Amino acid sequence: ARIAKAAAYLEHYKEFEVCNVNYRITNSLAMELSGKLLNEEHYRERGRQLKKMALDCLTEDGLLIGEGKPVDGFSPKGCRPVDIGYNMEESLPSLVQYAYETDDEKLKETVKKALKYHLKFMLGDGAIDNSFGTRNYKWTYWGSRTSDGCMLGYLLAAEDEPVFGAAAKKNLNLL
């Protein structure tokens, strides 16, 4: 009953359409899982809608933008809101989980490209350089205080990309 109540609330919460991209992504996964668990296709459909909105925030290179205002636009100085750390520890792991949960091969490849792009910001010892991220104020050397970590996302995608498994291990060793 609690999951059904939470899913009903999340399904109609319109803030996901204008807030930071990580909420679109994590809620798309929540909607997919709720739809499967409760056998309610409309939750899964809402998950697909949110996933599509989130994918609009991926650049051609694989950089995830949208962690700030304006989510899908430019600041007065022409900048995009980016949070590398949160992308690596929250958004991309949730998106790769969604891809595997839905068995979406195209999405798996898209997310792997994004994961690979974001690895440019992982230091040799596994730390993530989030010095310019929109949430850099709550970043520690080993990661964020409010995200799940990059390990699950990189490990899920490591089957064809051994470098992902190595990155996850290095990051885990910092803890």
Label each region the model flagged.
Residues 5-175:
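Extracellular polysaccharide-recognition and catalytic grooves
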